[in-house]
Every structure is written in structure tokens, then in C-alpha cells.
């Protein structure tokens, strides 16, 4: 691994950029908005630096770090996520006036940690990457110190996050104690040549508990609605997409290498299936009575975690491809939804409820249509991208014999239509209290158009995207 390649990796470039911006801000006192724009430029430059190495493959740092097509795909995903979160931060008016520049800069470290997780091949590096991400969110969630709800959310996230990290470390300790190594290859080799014993299974269970927190999977979901509601909306979006994806990219890595042996599979497949079943049931049913939009989307996120776990439980190539495709569909829909929420928060600083969407079509038709496409995609209705994501997950799970899981998942998806369509009904068929127009900047209009049209086109042309994901996995 030469020095130029190391510099061009997103985790290295973004970390160095963040350090430079922090020092520059401390010495030169740059305007906060200028810092935010520079952060957006950093994400674009990181994406450009990635291009020459897309086809590269290799294992580096004595087996700790892998560079393959799947790693590149997830790094691109995290760069897009970081870029969009930074734009949402610039658009949001609810941030604290003090230390706003740090609010723009710190996500660079978070994205670097997520990019590192895309390439992990060792449990120690896995823990380091997850802690970079988790500790960053401890700061972000409680950033709005003047709001009691933000402090409450921050404390809850800190306590449960620390507990999850403890389980993860304990699981890694069990795996190391039995196999004598933390490298994925060595653990897989040990499982092939030796019977999988009780302590090793216990280590696997502890690791799944730790990662279940990141995925907001039931029964490790209790923090999700409160933290989503209490955190600032850009950070809620980052938790819903980036943090969840970080947990799943690690699950994809460990379940398909160190724990791929049939001796492990007969234990983790039922556990993953149970978490998937509980998540789709609890997430969808708990979302129905919610009136706060962020809390509703928090429970919705739990249900989507269940559908993603359904793809993992299939333990086949189709299931892994379904998880990746589903995440891209989910990212597009969630960012469109939360961008609309941020725009509404300018007039509702205390929080946006479902009734605040009443007559949105009359106030700004682009916002209404963007939110409608987002809700329809999250609900899994054709022909949008979210429909094909759910269809792939169901097909993969059915093909692997998880028939009950698919039937329950389909019923829960149907139940979820109630709260998704409720938002659409409020925007188009409910009279508003006032018809005050909402004006948007040209950049925000463009982003809403891109997210809306992207969800439609990637639904109509899902086949080439699915083939691309399949080629990455091959």
C-alpha cells in the first residue's frame, strides 16, 4: 500500500481534512457557513480521489484491512451520506449558534470511521471503527444543549451505546480466547478445522447484541424513538442512514467470513430471523399511533432494520445484494423526507407533527411531491425504488426457506401503509390552517428534484443497479 493510495482513501483524506479545518477555524476564525461549504467540497474531493482505485483489490496491514469492490461501494455510500447530512446541516436553522463550525467539521471524522468499517478484516479494527462512529454521535445527539430533550436523548444514547460496546468487546474477547486470533480469516479457518463450541457461540451472540444496537433491531431498539426525536434533524438523518448502515456493513462482513461456517450459521440464522421478525412487527405497529414525524420515522427505521435483517437471514448472495440495494433505496427516501421536515421546522421550531403537513401541496408543491415519493418508497409501493428493495428481500428470504418470516413481513408492510399514506393524505387532501407559501433556495429545489427523480428512475431501471450490486458481490 503506497503513500498516495493511503492518502486517497476516504478515511485518511477526510480525517486529515477535518484536522486542517479545525486548526484553520481556531487560528483564522472562518465564517461558519464557509466551513460548511468547505466540508461539502471535502466530500466531493474524497469521491474524486477514490475513482483511480475503484478496480484495485488487496489485503493490507497484515490482514487488518481489505480493499475490494464491496468496500468501495460502501465508501461511496458513506460519502454520499456525509455530503447530504452536511447540506441538511447548512439548511437547518435549529443548530446552536455557538460552535456551529465544529458541527460541520466533526461529521468528517464520523464518515471516516464508517469508511474504515467498510474495509475491516479484523475484530480490533472493527471495534476501533465502530467507536469512532459511536463517540461522534454521543457529541452530535446532545449538541443542542439548551434543549432538555436533546440532553435526555444524548444521555440515553451514551448509556445504551456504552452497554452495546461492552457486549461487543466481551464477544471479541471470547472469540480471541478460543481461536487465538482476531483476524476474520483465522477465525474462519479455526471454525473449519475445529468444532464450534459453547464459548465461541457465546462470543458470536455478544457480538450480535452489540451490532443489534447499531441496527436499531428489536429488542435493542429502545433508544431509537427518543433519540431520533431529541436530536437535531440532520443528526437524526445521519443516525437513520449512516449509523444503521455502519452496523449492517459490519454484519455483512462478519457473517460472510469469520462466522460463515455451517457450525456458526445454525446458531446465528435463527437469532437474526427472530430479530427481523420482532423488528418488523414492533416497528410498524408502534409507528401507527405516532403524531410526531421524527418519532414516527424512528419506529419506521426499526421496521426497515427488520426487513434488512430478513435479507441477512437468507444467508445467500441474493440476500446480500438485496441488503445493499435496499440501503440505497432507503437512503434516497429518508433524505428526501428529512429535508422536507427541516424546511417545515423553520416555522415549527418546537417539532413537526403530522398535522403540520396539512395542505403542504398548497404551500409548496415540490416539497409535497418529494415527501409523497419518499413515503411511497418507504412503504414499498411500486414503481419506486423501495418496492424493489422489499421485493428482493422477500424473494431472498423465501428462497432460503424463511416462509413464515416473509408472510409476517408482508403483513407488517401492509400495516405500515396506514402511517405512510396518512402523511400523503394530510399533504394533499387536508385543509391547512394557513396557506403561507414556503420559498426554497435553488440548491434545495435541485436536491429535492434529484432525490425524487432518482427514486423513480432507480425503480424503473432497478435491473442494472441490481446487476451492478451482484457484480460487486461476485
UniProtKB/Swiss-Prot annotation:
UniProt keyword list: Cell inner membrane, Cell membrane, Membrane, NAD, Quinone, Translocase, Transmembrane, Transmembrane helix, Transport, Ubiquinone
MF terms in GO: NADH dehydrogenase (ubiquinone) activity; NADH:ubiquinone reductase (non-electrogenic) activity; quinone binding
Class in the EC hierarchy, top level: translocase
The reaction(s) this protein catalyses: a quinone + NADH + 5 H(+)(in) = a quinol + NAD(+) + 4 H(+)(out)
Cellular compartment(s): Cell inner membrane
InterPro entries on file: NADH-Q_OxRdtase_suN/2, ND/Mrp_TM
Regions crossing the membrane: 4-24, 34-54, 70-90, 103-120, 123-143, 158-178, 200-220, 239-259, 268-288, 296-313, 323-343, 366-388, 404-424, 446-466
Transmembrane in keyword set: yes
Membrane topology per record: Multi-pass membrane protein
Subunit structure: NDH-1 is composed of 14 different subunits. Subunits NuoA, H, J, K, L, M, N constitute the membrane sector of the complex.
Protein role: NDH-1 shuttles electrons from NADH, via FMN and iron-sulfur (Fe-S) centers, to quinones in the respiratory chain. The immediate electron acceptor for the enzyme in this species is believed to be ubiquinone. Couples the redox reaction to proton translocation (for every two electrons transferred, four hydrogen ions are translocated across the cytoplasmic membrane), and thus conserves the redox energy in a proton gradient.
HAMAP family linked to this entry: NDH1_NuoN_1
The protein, known as: NADH-quinone oxidoreductase subunit N
Source organism of the structure: Methylacidiphilum infernorum (isolate V4)
Gene encoding the protein: nuoN
Amino acid at each position: 500500500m503506497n503513500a498516495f493510495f493511503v492518502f486517497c482513501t476516504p478515511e485518511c483524506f477526510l480525517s486529515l481534512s477535518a484536522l486542517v479545518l479545525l486548526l484553520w477555524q481556531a487560528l483564522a476564525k472562518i465564517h461558519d457557513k464557509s466551513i460548511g461549504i468547505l466540508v461539502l467540497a471535502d466530500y466531493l474531493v474524497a469521491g474524486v480521489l477514490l475513482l483511480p482505485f475503484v478496480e484495485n483489490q488487496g489485503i493490507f496491514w497484515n490482514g487488518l484491512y481489505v480493499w475490494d469492490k464491496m468496500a468501495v461501494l460502501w465508501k461511496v455510500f458513506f460519502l454520499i451520506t456525509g455530503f447530504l447530512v452536511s447540506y441538511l446541516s447548512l439548511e437547518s436553522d435549529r443548530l446552536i449558534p455557538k460552535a456551529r463550525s465544529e458541527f460541520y467539521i466533526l461529521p468528517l471524522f464520523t464518515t471516516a470511521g464508517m469508511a474504515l468499517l467498510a474495509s475491516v478484516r479484523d475484530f480490533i479494527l472493527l471495534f476501533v471503527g465502530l467507536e469512532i462512529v459511536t463517540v461522534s454521535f454521543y457529541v452530535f445527539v446532545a449538541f443542542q444543549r439548551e434543549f432538555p430533550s436533546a440532553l435526555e436523548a444524548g444521555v440515553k444514547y451514551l448509556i445504551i451505546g456504552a452497554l452495546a460496546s461492552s457486549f461487543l468487546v466481551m464477544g471479541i474477547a471470547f472469540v480471541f480466547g478460543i481461536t487465538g486470533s482476531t483476524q476474520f480469516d483465522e477465525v474462519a479457518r479455526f471454525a473449519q478445522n475445529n468444532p464450534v463450541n459453547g464459548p465461541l457461540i457465546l462470543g458470536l451472540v455478544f457480538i450480535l447484541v452489540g451490532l443489534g444496537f447499531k441496527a436499531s433491531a428489536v429488542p435493542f431498539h429502545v433508544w431509537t424513538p427518543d433519540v431520533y426525536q431529541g436530536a437535531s434533524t440532520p443528526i437524526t438523518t445521519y443516525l437513520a442512514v449512516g449509523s444503521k448502515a455502519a452496523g449492517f456493513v459490519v454484519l455483512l462482513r462478519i457473517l460472510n467470513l469469520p462466522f460463515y461456517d455451517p457450525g456458526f450459521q445454525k446458531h446465528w440464522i435463527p437469532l437474526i430471523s427472530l430479530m427481523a421478525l420482532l423488528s418488523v412487527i414492533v416497528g410498524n405497529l408502534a409507528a401507527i399511533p405516532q403524531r410526531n414525524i421524527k418519532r414516527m420515522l424512528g419506529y419506521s427505521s426499526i421496521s426497515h432494520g427488520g426487513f434488512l435483517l430478513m435479507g441477512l437471514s437468507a444467508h445467500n448472495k441474493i440476500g446480500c445484494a438485496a441488503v445493499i440495494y435496499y440501503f440505497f433505496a432507503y437512503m434516497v427516501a429518508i433524505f428526501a423526507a428529512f429535508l422536507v421536515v427541516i424546511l417545515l421546522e423553520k416555522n415549527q421550531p418546537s417539532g413537526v407533527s403530522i398535522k403540520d403537513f396539512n395542505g403542504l401541496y398548497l404551500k409548496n408543491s415540490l416539497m409535497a411531491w418529494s415527501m409523497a415519493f419518499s413515503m411511497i418508497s418507504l412503504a414499498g409501493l411500486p414503481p419506486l425504488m423501495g418496492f424493489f428493495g422489499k421485493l428482493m428481500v422477500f424473494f431472498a428470504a423465501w428462497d432460503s426457506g424463511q416462509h413464515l418470516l416473509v408472510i409476517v413481513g408482508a403483513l407488517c408492510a401492509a400495516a405500515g401503509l396506514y402511517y405512510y399514506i396518512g402523511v400523503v393524505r394530510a399533504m394533499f387532501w387536508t385543509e391547512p390552517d394557513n396557506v403561507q407559501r414556503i420559498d426554497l433556495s435553488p440548491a434545495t429545489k435541485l436536491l429535492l428534484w434529484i432525490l425524487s427523480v432518482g427514486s423513480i428512475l432507480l425503480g424503473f431501471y432497478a435491473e442494472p443497479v441490481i446487476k451492478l450490486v451482484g457484480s460487486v458481490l461476485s
